[in-house]
Amino acid sequence: MLTDLCRLGTDKTAAPAAVFPSASPTASPNWRRLDYLAHGNPRQRSAHALLTAGVWDELATQCADMALVSTLAIGLDRPGSDLDILCQHPNPAEFAATFAEQGWQASDKGGNIWLLERTFACLDQSCANSGSDKSEASWPLELYVTPAPIETLNGWRHLTLMAALLERFGDAFYRDVLRLRLEEGLKGEAAMCRLLGLAGDPYEALLMLEERNLAELSWQLPSRDDIHTSTGAAAPAAHYSSPVVSTTSATPVCPVSTESPIPTS
């Protein structure tokens, strides 16, 4: 039984909740692991089935370090969301050339960073039968390849902070962030910044929380009237964020989960 997971929300079919690695007093969540996905909601289990069928192991033979930093890792993905994987490799161009020969689409993003993209069909039957929408029957994968240590990259740092905020504020906050994701199309970072009243570029605003004690932050569940009358005036502007821009990182202060979710079968 995995007892180091935070468990939040349920999906539209009342299936098991989303899960993610909980923070500990001495360490932030470990996004290198995949095991927790097997105990999550249907989309998390679908991604686990695909990645553990050979994709992850194949990448691991080439990479010095890897991490899954998709919003799926914290249950905030939408149909069509990518599986974003950070890959540390000493020669990203060489890595890109090798995988381009295997059907991956490679593009040079500059700064010794390469992006590789490929779409895989779902392997689990429940995903394949989920509907006629192609986005729900396949997984787009994006590999961000760089020689930089993955824990210094924005993708790792953003996901760590978002997980800590979900753990800090719980299920109601999770549902409100997911509502903004699904109904208004906001990125996870932008949705959280709106709810917390953080102005400016949401990606930069979120990283500023690395220097703060998250226990000092406050958030109040909006009333139903607030949800329907909100004009979005406090919403941060839309910005593009690369998961691999590296800057000096401090360890976020994350509360420890008191939950011990029972894994699904």
Predicted regions and their residues:
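Catalytic cores of NTP-dependent nucleotidyl/adenyl transfer enzymes across multiple folds
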Residues: 151-232, 236, 240, 254, ...
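Intrinsically disordered, low-complexity terminal tails and inter-domain linkers enriched
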Residues: 5-28, 121-136, 227-265
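Active-site nucleotide-donor binding segment shared across nucleotidyl transfer reactions
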Residues: 55-94
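A general structural signal for short secondary-structure boundary/capping elements
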Residues: 56, 140-146, 187-195
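Short amphipathic alpha-helices in soluble, non-transmembrane regions
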Residues: 95-103
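Short, well-ordered coil/turn elements that cap or connect secondary structure elements
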Residues: 61-63, 101, 138
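Helical scaffold of the NTase/Pol beta-like nucleotidyltransferase catalytic core
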Residues: 2-69, 229, 265
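Conserved catalytic core of two-metal-ion nucleotidyltransferases
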Residues: 104-127, 131-151
